[in-house]
Structures are given as C-alpha cells and as structure tokens.
Amino acid sequence: MTKKNLPLNFLLDKILKRLIQVTIALLATLLIFVGSFPSLAAETTTIPLTEEQWQQGEEMAQKAIEASQKGDFPQAEAYWTQLIDEFPTNPALWSNRGNVRVSQNKLDEAIADYNQAIKLAPDHPDPYLNRGTALEGKGMYQEAIADYNQVLAINPEDAMAYNNRGNAQAGEGNWQQALQDYQKATELAPNFAFASANAALTLYQLGESERALQKIRNLVRKYPLFPDMRAALTAILWTKGQQGEAESNWVAAVGMDYRYQDLDWVRNIRRWPPAMVAALDNFLKLKL
C-alpha cells in the first residue's frame, strides 16, 4: 500500500500533484505494496484566507505529513482533525485524515472521511481511489471495484486505479481480469514496479510459470533491493529444484523484509495469489 496527501494550499484552488507517502507500515496496511493507492485533488471555491491563517494551516499540514512519515499516525490524525475543525469544507483535509485512519486500521472511520471528501468534490477521482483502498481492507471487493471504475471514468489513464482494481479483482478470484488490469497499469506507467510484480505473481497463479519466472527475474535484475520479488523467486526456484539459487535469494529477501517468513502476512496482508503462497509454504516447510 502508499497514500497521497495534499498540502493545505489546496484551499487556494490549485490542482496539486498527488503526494505519495512511502512508509513500510502504510504499505503493509494498504495491502499491496502498491496494491491500493489513495489520494485527492480538486478545484474548490473557498473563503479568502488571511496570510496568517494560510501560514498556520500550511505549518499544521506539514506537521501532519511529517508525523505520518515517522509512523506516528495518531498524531497525524489529530493534526488533520484540527485543520478540519478550522476548514470543514476542504475535501483534501477529509481525505488526508482518512488516509491516516486507514494506516491505523480505522477503516469505517476512514470511509466516512472519504464519503465527506466525495460529497465536497464529487467530480475528482482521488477520493474514490482512497475509499476503494479502505473498502478492499474490509474485503468489500465489488464495492472497491466500483470506486476504481469511477476513477477510470474520470481519468482513463490512472495507472494506480488499474493496479488497485487488479488487486480487488484478485480478491474476487478473477485472475484473468486482474492480470489485464496490472498489465494496463504497467503500460501506462512502465516503471510502476509493484504493478509489474503483481502481474508476475498473477501469471504464476494462471499456470504460466515460465513467463512468471522470466518476469520476476527481470524485476530482480532491475530492482535488486525488491524483497517481494526476491521472495517470489525463491519460491519458484525451489519448486524447480534449484535450491542453491533459491536459498541465496531467500537470504536477500528476509534480510530486507523479515515478514516474508510469515505466511499469514504474505497471504492476508501482501495478498499473494494462492499458488504463490503454496510455493512459498513448500519452501518454508522443507527449510524448517
């Protein structure tokens, strides 16, 4: 998972680029290592602010972002709440608070925040993307797909929405549709590494193990510090009897991210496809 927060100068009617916060805790909560991304940006009419109000708001928004980057999500939530109390008609603030609530697994409260952001900015794609992520966290995949469809109706070239919809399709067991979405995401954003990773894992689930292996090898070469693909390469190589190479990739994978030793995390948080989970399980059982 990653999230995107907008600075407070959203209040000045600027359409701002999505700002991705990358933290390990946030990615894990969002299921996807790039599985499901939220964000927000839209035009709005606001009451003119004094220079002092603008400065105070900017400072508090920056504190909220810094708190999130440090993993202090309760403090970040408190900052966004203060800003909402001051500027309740700003949809970005509601969406940003929803993001940090997702990070604390407060999914229902996050969805309520995204609902308010959508009410205030119904024609902007980002709050739908955010809400889709939270819905995925609750296992409400069809509802998440509907939100991602709305994003794509507004912006047909949103690579994150395709990746996220692929995750939701995978949650429903629609592996072919998931693959198509992941591939579209990588077509739109060739350097979207996690979408490429999701496509590779899905190929394995669909029985195309050689294509999956080739794609995973390519990703490991391009991104040698990518533990997800190191762990996947370990699992596939082990099933092919290439124990030595499997072991060396495993040492690298767990050295970067120990969570791959936890099948429950791999299955339910990272959400690898069942065939990949089974391959890793086979490796771990024999290893232990």
Feature names for model-found ranges:
Residues E86, L120, I154, L188, ...:
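Structural marker of alpha-solenoid helical repeat scaffolds
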Residues R217, R221, P227, A231-Q261:
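TPR/TPR-like (Sel1-like) alpha-helical repeat modules
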Residues I24, A28-F87, L288:
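N-terminal leader/linker segments that initiate helical-solenoid repeat arrays
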Residues E58-Q69, T81, A92-S103, A112-N115, ...:
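Conserved alpha-helical positions within TPR/SEL1-like repeat arrays
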